[in-house]
Curated annotation (Swiss-Prot):
BP GO terms, sorted: mRNA processing; regulation of gene expression; rRNA processing; tRNA processing
Residues bound to Mg(2+): 54, 127, 130
Disulfide bond annotation, renumbered to this chain: none
Active site positions, chain numbering: 58, 130
EC number: 3.1.26.3
Pfam family, one: dsrm
Subcellular localization: Cytoplasm
Name this polypeptide is given: Ribonuclease 3
Subunit structure: Homodimer.
Organism: Thermotoga petrophila (strain ATCC BAA-488 / DSM 13995 / JCM 10881 / RKU-1)
InterPro entries: dsRBD_dom, RNase_III, RNase_III_dom, RNase_III_sf
Segments forming domain DRBM: 168-237
Cellular component GO terms held in the UniProt record: cytoplasm
Designated gene of the protein: rnc
């Protein structure tokens, strides 16, 4: 880590209260592949992306969620538990948890990802949270993950088991728009972009032909969901 990177790592720990014995693990968890690629091309060999940590974190998350489900819902059918596990470990939930941590603020992103709104993209936030879980697991063990996140995930899982999750931004936006404008929102693919070799879809959500928000994603569906989320939050803010 260089000095500017170390400051961000230290600020993350200060703001979240999640302290690391090995700060290099935290730094790696916060490094998106776009940033690692840029730094590697610039000659730095000490910067590794969070992809391997994400791989481990996916397994840690699955165990963590399954343990909560197994202990709290002993009478539930296996099929219901499996569906709840998928929902609790979904991109949407992980992105919500990441936003509560303000994780996006501390991510190291390449210039392209920064420019295209990667800091608030669900997929990047969800992947980074999985990487963070792995870093915590390696640094302090499984018990620390339970200490930090068990209560929060129990609340999400309770909502899921009651059928209250997941929050569907497209449906929520449609309800608001149709109640006020009597027409559904329209999703329009406006362009595709290249970012570190990846194809990024850019979708605009329109009401009565007027653009109200734009979203980006690795698939058209992901971009539509992101556009719906931004539009929904914007309309709620305007109402308040």
């Amino acid at each position: 880590m260089n000095e500017s990177e170390r400051k961000i790592v230290e600020e993350f720990q200060k703001k979240t209260g999640i302290n690391f014995k090995n700060e290099e693990l935290l730094f790696r968890a916060l490094c998106h592949s776009s940033y690692a690629n840029e730094q590697n091309q610039a000659g730095r060999k000490d910067v590794e992306s969070n992809e391997k940590l994400e791989f481990l974190g996916d397994a840690v998350l699955e165990l963590f969620v399954c343990e909560i489900l197994y202990k709290k819902y002993p009478e539930a059918e296996v099929g219901d538990l499996a569906r709840a596990k998928s929902a609790a470990a979904s991109e949407e939930v992980l992105a919500m948890v990441s936003r509560e941590l303000n994780l996006g603020k501390f991510l190291f992103l390449g210039k392209g990802e920064e420019k295209t709104g990667g800091r608030d993209r669900d997929s990047i936030l969800a992947d980074a949270f999985e990487a963070l879980l792995a870093a915590i697991y390696l640094d302090q063990g499984y018990h620390k993950i339970k200490e930090l996140f068990e209560e929060e995930f129990e609340l999400y899982i309770e909502k899921i088991m009651r059928g209250e999750m997941l929050f569907d931004y497209k449906t929520a936006l449609q309800e608001i728009v149709q109640s006020e404008h009597k027409v559904p929102p329209e999703y329009v693919l406006v362009r595709t972009e290249k970012n570190d070799g990846d194809r990024i879809f850019v979708v605009e959500v329109r009401v009565d032909g007027k653009s109200i928000a734009m979203g980006r994603g690795r698939t058209k569906k992901e971009a539509e969901k992101e556009a719906a989320r931004i539009a929904y939050e914007k309309l709620l803010k305007e109402r308040s």
